[in-house]
């Protein structure tokens, strides 16, 4: 019996309060809101390169990591630390971003009109 990849095991759980799937990172401000929400609650994981239905699409380039880094450094106050791991799953790259619950909360991030708001992650 083939052992399940750790990322496939996470995907099998489906999205919930501590797990979010992102097809791609195209908006650093939007990702900053997700980083802040995880940091302000119980922490969590972002799986970049995974569609909402759980299908693995893979990340397209190194730029995805740099957009997450920019989101944290430029658009979260105080900055939300994160750890990122690249995984190869069935020939596709998935970027796992772990955000711990923060001792420095509340963290804020800009809304769609650039007002910095305190956000939380709910189920």
Where on the chain are the PLM-derived regions?
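Conserved N-terminal catalytic/coupling substructures associated with nucleotide/phosphate chemistry
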Residues: 1-123
């Amino acid at each position: 019996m083939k052992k399940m990849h750790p990322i496939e095991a996470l995907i099998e759980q489906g999205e919930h309060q501590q797990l979010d799937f992102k097809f791609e990172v195209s908006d650093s401000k939007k990702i900053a809101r997700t980083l802040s929400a995880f940091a302000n609650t119980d922490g969590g994981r972002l799986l970049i390169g995974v569609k909402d239905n759980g299908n693995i699409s893979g990340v397209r380039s190194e730029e995805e990591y740099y957009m997450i880094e920019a989101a944290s450094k430029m658009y979260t106050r105080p900055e939300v630390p994160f750890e990122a791991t690249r995984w190869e799953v069935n020939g596709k790259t998935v970027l796992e971003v772990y955000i711990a619950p923060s001792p420095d909360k509340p963290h804020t991030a800009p809304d769609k009109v650039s007002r910095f708001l305190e956000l939380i992650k709910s189920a």
